[in-house]
């Protein structure tokens, strides 16, 4: 099913010597047997000349995630890292030795901690490169990222600790570097090229410490991870949310689903030689529902552009959330 609308928008002629034509399309398709799962493409085609200011092109981007990507990729801005500091009493080597035993502090791309809740808890992290020469590829735009041109992978370690009257107390850490894959089968969003298979994240974008209270006893930790793809004349960027809970002395993953995608591709040239830019976006929101299954609240991924949704239910056998009607 295809819905399409076109509108023409004129701008101040003192700033632009052309008109932008915005075309919006929504396409919906059922995914497997999940009747309410749909895949959405929202495309905006901007016909501009070289005199178009970056702010006008950026104005076509609807979501904050896309504007941040545009600022980094097109405007060269280095946005602040998330949590790049340590509380008093926690030395970088102390945190690194706990999170990543045997890894050298000389290979640290970043290290930090962020308060979690109000019980003196912190989520600490360390991003470690393979060789010292790899540090030159760390540009500060992510907590921990893979350099796309060099295909250089960095390892991201993380764990929860407590400061008790200034004394460091290790509570739970992820077993090794972050390697939980993401799959687009039930995401409502456009996928990466290999999105039909499990894809390990290329970068860590943000520590998301919103109160994800998945049960009456457990609050999950959120980590936003990222992926990127390059194409002739453009690129694509994707973000996913991963949730982790404390299980003994380990942090274990219980949810890993796509939340956003942004594509900026070169379009066709018109009869005047103007080349279009095609910007595709899609975004999910995660909702915690009031109903429970096996002691855990149901989760819902809702597409903010077309309202489609997929519900997830706790599986005791799998030890994680699964699509409620995943086929």
Q: PLM features: residue spans?
A:
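Short consensus segments that form the blades of beta-propeller domains
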Residues: 135-152, 230-236
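Bacterial N-terminal signal peptides
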Residues: 17-29
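Acidic, small-residue rich beta-repeat scaffolds with periodic aromatic anchors
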Residues: 32-119, 148, 235-327
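Acidic/hydrophobic-patterned starts of short beta strands in beta-sheet-rich repeat architectures
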Residues: 117-128, 213-227, 288, 292-300
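Eukaryote-skewed repeat-based solenoidal scaffolds used as protein-protein interaction platforms
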Residues: 198-237, 241
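N-terminal secretory signal peptides that target proteins for export/translocation
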Residues: 1-12
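Short N-terminal edge-element motif at the start of the domain
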Residues: 143-213
């Amino acid at each position: 099913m295809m819905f399409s609308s076109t509108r023409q928008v004129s701008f101040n002629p003192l700033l632009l010597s052309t008109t932008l034509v915005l075309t919006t399309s929504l396409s919906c398709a059922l995914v497997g047997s999940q009747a309410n799962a749909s895949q959405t493409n929202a495309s905006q085609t901007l016909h501009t000349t070289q005199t178009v200011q970056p702010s006008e092109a950026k104005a076509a981007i609807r979501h904050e995630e896309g504007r941040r990507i545009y600022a980094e990729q097109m405007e060269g801005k280095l946005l602040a890292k998330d949590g790049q500091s340590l509380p008093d009493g926690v030395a970088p080597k102390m945190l690194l030795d706990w999170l990543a035993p045997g890894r050298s502090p000389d290979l640290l791309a970043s290290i930090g901690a962020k308060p979690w809740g109000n019980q003196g808890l912190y989520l600490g992290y360390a991003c470690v490169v393979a060789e010292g020469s790899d540090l030159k590829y760390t540009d500060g735009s992510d907590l921990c990222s893979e350099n796309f041109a060099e295909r250089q992978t960095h390892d991201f370690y993380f764990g929860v600790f407590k400061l008790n009257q200034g004394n460091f107390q290790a509570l739970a850490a992820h077993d090794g570097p972050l390697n939980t894959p993401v799959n687009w089968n039930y995401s409502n969003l456009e996928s990466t090229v290999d999105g039909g298979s499990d894809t390990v994240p290329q970068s860590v974008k943000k520590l998301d410490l919103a109160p994800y209270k998945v049960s009456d006893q457990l609050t999950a930790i959120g980590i936003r991870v990222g992926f990127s793809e390059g194409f002739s004349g453009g690129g694509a960027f994707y973000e996913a949310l991963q949730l982790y809970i404390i299980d003994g002395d380990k942090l274990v993953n219980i949810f890993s689903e796509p939340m956003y995608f942004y594509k900026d591709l070169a379009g066709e040239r018109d009869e005047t030689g103007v080349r279009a830019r095609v910007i595709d976006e899609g975004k999910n929101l995660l909702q915690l529902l009031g109903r429970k299954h096996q002691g855990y609240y149901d989760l819902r991924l809702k597409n903010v552009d077309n309202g489609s949704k997929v519900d997830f239910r706790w599986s005791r056998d799998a030890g994680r959330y699964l699509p409620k009607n995943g086929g």
